[in-house]
């Protein structure tokens, strides 16, 4: 086999290795905390003939993304006049690092535009952060207003689960107040997490969390997991019969703890693809080495 074929194989090997790198990058570029939980879009479209609202909205997005490198909560109002101002905020989950917070929040402006378009108010909630904005004069809602709920499909009634979950709820409610707005813990294989919006006091936070937990008990019953999102706080729980998995955040995504099997399936698929691509790359490298040796031997015999 000539030098030209060897060159082709070398190029193929480089392409395979590049693909392998892209697969690893793609896997690491979509962390758990960027999963979309829900969106809330005002029905009324934004009338903006002067473009002032758009300017204020763009400035607000820029401020929120910039501040997400320094803090997990930030609220601001932008605009040239009070009539054309926009108030917005973001909040990251309390267990995220500054870097993770930024990675989460930086996705929200684009997502908000894609999911809601230009409306007078919008809210986009990911697993690890959310963004909210509204124009001046937008009607306010109660902090206890239910925005979104989800309960796991599997039930675990009759196993003592509800008693354990309710005990975990009590621990979490006290912990959120003591933690000034965020708390996560595990109690007898029940993982619970609660967080309040960063601009409310401990007393209001406690009331909001209590309301959310009561809703979780009623709405989700004996479901293996659940999430309740109110306007000013949210709670989530998940029961893991075999123990809470050791990972950066076992906070349940918007299905149930059964969703962990989905994550596991995704991870298995990724590993399988990586093994196939890696194996192919290894074989390709071996073939190239053998051909290189063959060419050297051929050249040696040609010289005699």
Swiss-Prot record:
Compartment(s) where it occurs, according to its Swiss-Prot or TrEMBL record: Cell membrane; Cell junction, Plasmodesma
Tissue expression profile of the protein: Highly expressed in inflorescence pedacel and shoot apex. Expressed in the outermost L1 layer of the shoot apical meristem and in the epidermis of bulging floral primordia. Within the L1, expression was restricted to the peripheral zone (at protein level).
Disulfide bonds: 41-116, 92-101, 104-129, 151-220, 196-205, 208-233
UniProt keyword annotation of Signal present: yes
Chief localisation class: membrane
UniProt entry keywords in alphabetical sequence: Cell junction, Cell membrane, Disulfide bond, Host-virus interaction, Membrane, Repeat, Signal, Transmembrane, Transmembrane helix, Transport
One BP term from GO: plasmodesmata-mediated intercellular transport
Family statement: Belongs to the cysteine-rich repeat secretory protein family. Plasmodesmata-located proteins (PDLD) subfamily.
Protein name per Swiss-Prot or TrEMBL: Plasmodesmata-located protein 3
Protein's organism: Arabidopsis thaliana (Mouse-ear cress)
Lineage, broadest ranks: Eukaryota, Viridiplantae, Streptophyta, Embryophyta, Tracheophyta
């Amino acid at each position: 086999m000539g030098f030209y074929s060897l060159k082709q194989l070398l190029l193929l090997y480089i392409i395979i290795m590049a693909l392998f790198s892209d697969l690893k990058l793609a896997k690491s570029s979509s962390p758990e905390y960027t999963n979309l939980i829900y969106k809330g879009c005002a029905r009324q479209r934004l009338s903006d003939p002067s473009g002032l609202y758009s300017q204020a909205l763009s400035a607000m997005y820029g401020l929120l993304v910039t501040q997400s490198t320094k803090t997990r909560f930030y609220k601001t109002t932008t605009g040239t006049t009070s009539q054309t101002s926009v108030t917005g905020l973001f909040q990251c989950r309390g267990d995220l690092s500054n870097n993770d917070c930024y990675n989460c929040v930086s996705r929200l402006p684009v997502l908000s535009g894609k999911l809601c378009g230009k409306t007078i108010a919008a809210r986009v909630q990911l697993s690890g952060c959310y963004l909210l904005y509204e124009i001046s004069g937008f009607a306010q809602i109660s902090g206890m207003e239910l925005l979104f709920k989800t309960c796991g499909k599997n039930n675990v009634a009759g196993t003592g689960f509800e008693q354990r979950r309710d005990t975990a709820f009590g621990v979490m409610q006290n912990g959120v107040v003591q933690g000034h707005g965020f708390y996560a813990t595990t109690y007898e294989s029940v993982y619970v997490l609660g967080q309040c919006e960063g601009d409310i006091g401990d007393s209001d936070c406690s009331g909001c969390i209590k309301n959310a937990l009561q809703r979780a008990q009623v709405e989700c019953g004996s479901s293996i997991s659940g999430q309740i999102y109110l306007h000013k706080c949210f709670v989530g729980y998940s029961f893991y019969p075999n123990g809470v998995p050791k990972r950066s955040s076992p906070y349940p995504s918007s299905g149930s703890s059964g969703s962990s099997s989905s994550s596991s399936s995704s991870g298995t698929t990724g590993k399988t693809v990586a093994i196939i691509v890696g194996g192919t790359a290894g074989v390709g490298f071996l073939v190239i080495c053998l051909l290189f040796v063959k060419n050297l031997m051929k050249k040696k015999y040609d010289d005699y």
